[in-house]
């Protein structure tokens, strides 16, 4: 396994292709998520001296140039690259190792390193408290009258006389930005631009994800 603490921070935008299973060196089944990683292109560089922090802005995905507004088109023109659909800024330890127009591919990661994957979770629509928050519901019998899936009390009448902010209630479920931390990179297929990451990641098939070096440095390695 690779220790992230001794490696520079890295990141890449990609597309979730789905899940499959592979075998490790001991013939054990390993569930993996396949990500089409990149190619990304560096469109802007942030430095400590000028911006107060170190990061690179990367772009990913094809788009018709006619669908890009003028400010964004000007940003791409300044970088000397064709317009892309998605833009993200990724913090790095040393931005001087990057340059505008540089291409970033799947080989930015090594097998055995640990990553954090950010995506948009699947939308579930309007959901009640039992599905959305895991409430147990109320009694199934013994006088329970049409309250089996209701949440119960949401606050007092006179004191406090209001519903506190953050009260867990029914509402839209999913379609949130979610990050899963400390996932192991099982395999890097640089030739096909694929990352095989052990375990599940947020989002649907075809969803755009950001893969970054684990901020906790592979805490469970």
Swiss-Prot record:
Gene3D superfamilies: 3.30.160.810, Translation factors (2.40.30.10). GO terms for molecular function: rRNA binding; structural constituent of ribosome. Keywords: Ribonucleoprotein, Ribosomal protein, RNA-binding, rRNA-binding. Belongs to the universal ribosomal protein uL3 family. PROSITE patterns: RIBOSOMAL_L3 (PS00474). GO terms for cellular component: cytosolic large ribosomal subunit. One of the primary rRNA binding proteins, it binds directly near the 3'-end of the 23S rRNA, where it nucleates assembly of the 50S subunit. NCBIfam families: L3_bact (TIGR03625). The keyword RNA-binding applies. Part of the 50S ribosomal subunit. Forms a cluster with proteins L14 and L19. GO terms for biological process: translation. It comes from the Bacteria. This is Large ribosomal subunit protein uL3. InterPro entries: Ribosomal_uL3, Ribosomal_uL3_bac/org-type, Ribosomal_uL3_CS, Transl_B-barrel_sf.
């Amino acid at each position: 396994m690779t220790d992230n603490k001794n490696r520079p921070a890295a990141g890449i935008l990609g597309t979730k292709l789905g899940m499959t299973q592979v075998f490790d060196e001991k013939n054990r089944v390993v569930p993996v998520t396949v990500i089409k990683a990149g190619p990304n292109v560096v469109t802007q560089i942030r430095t400590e001296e000028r911006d107060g922090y170190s990061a690179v802005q990367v772009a990913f995905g094809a788009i018709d140039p006619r669908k890009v507004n003028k400010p964004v088109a000007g940003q791409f023109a300044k970088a000397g690259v064709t317009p892309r659909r998605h833009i993200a800024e990724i913090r790095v330890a040393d931005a001087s190792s990057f340059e505008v127009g540089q291409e970033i591919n799947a080989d930015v990661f090594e097998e055995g390193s640990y990553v954090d994957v950010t995506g948009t979770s699947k939308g579930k629509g309007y959901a009640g408290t039992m599905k959305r928050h895991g409430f147990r519901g109320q009694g199934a019998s013994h006088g329970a009258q049409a309250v089996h899936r209701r949440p119960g009390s949401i606050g007092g009448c006179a004191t406090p006389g209001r519903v506190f902010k953050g009260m867990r209630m029914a509402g839209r479920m999913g379609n949130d930005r979610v990050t899963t931390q400390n996932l192991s990179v099982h395999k890097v297929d640089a030739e096909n631009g694929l990352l095989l990451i052990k375990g599940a990641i947020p989002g649907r098939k075809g969803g755009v994800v950001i893969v970054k070096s684990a901020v906790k440095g592979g805490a469970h390695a």
